[in-house]
Amino acid sequence: NQNSLKEIFMIGVRNPQGMALSPQGEIFITNHGAKGGDFLGKIKGGENYGWDKIGWGGTNYSGTKIGDGESFSEKFKSPILSWVPSIAPSDLVFYSGEEFLDWNGDILITSLKYKFLLKLEIDKGEIIDKEIIFKDEIGRLRDVDINSKGEIFIITDEKKSAIWKLKSNTN
């Protein structure tokens, strides 16, 4: 929109938590819905995901409909993946490294609510496989990062969280 402020990159998200660049330089986010309607999406300048007109399958915490009650609409950008019930996605990262060679290019997403690390295998921009790497083992997962060797580090949102390091069984 020509009348938009230049400072506004995009609109229509409720509570974006994680953001990462794909190997192709595209921007991806995780977004909290209300009661359901969390999503993984690709963003570009000027786009609108539709919050608070649509709820991506979720409802308000009170149980009432979001906006006009539509989950999705052709008027707005659609997410790549949405979750109902909510998983409370927090962070995401595209894997690149030597520690988990088969994971190169895959997306890793942390979940606060279900306390899991999710791996999404991507091929030509499409999700072709989903795998929960671990669940309910260390707490509510807040952040994930990868060092230059490809080692994966995770932190929870607990006050005295340790930094957890994932290791491959093959290395």
Could you describe each region identified by the protein language model?
Residues 143-171:
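Blade-level signature of beta-propeller repeat domains, shared across WD40, Kelch, NHL, RCC1
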Residues 1-131, 139, 149, 161, ...:
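Beta-propeller domain segments
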Residues 135:
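Short glycine-rich catalytic loops that host catalytic nucleophiles or stabilize transition states
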